[in-house]
Amino acid sequence: MSTKTLALIFSALWSACLYAAPVETLTQTCAQCHGETGVSTKAKIPHLNGQLSDYLEEDIRRIANGTRASTVPDHIPKSWTGEEVMAVADFYAASLGPRPAQTTDAAQVTRGAVWYKKRCADCHPDSGRESKRDAPLMAAQNLEYMKEQTRAFVSGKRKFVFLMDDAFKGLSAADLDGVAHYFASQEQFKK
């Protein structure tokens, strides 16, 4: 490799290091709703802590470019570089602070457990603590957020993979609420 090529590579790397914002700065906007460590302070806002980095990275990119619906579509800066998006996703994935316990309805949890086993467990195993097929982790996610998102999937406002359409097919609003109660009632991590 020539000296000129090495100099260009070094210069590009140095510039990237010099201009990449620290993750704490990048997450300041996120923290207003998702909390400093990704534990949301608002019922209809998802927890980000402990979520899969790849899932978060893809979601951030989709919200920023407008291909994923969001209640606050302009909250992710379009100027973030790929490295900055990865840094934010990695930051929240590594944040393992506990999510607060939620009030759930026992009858709804029982109803949701039945549907979870039939329709959700293949992609969200271990009661939503694990993932297959690029699915997000669901255990201990905000109840109101999950209820809102299931309605968005059913109405077509939000799209995921075809598997979600199959999973929701034929379920009533009460069944979907039951699944949300089931996931919300779970511990995020096994003890």
Which stretches of residues belong to each language-model region?
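C-terminal capping alpha-helices of c-type cytochrome domains
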Residues: 78-100, 144, 167-191
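Bacterial N-terminal signal peptides that target proteins for export
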Residues: 1-7
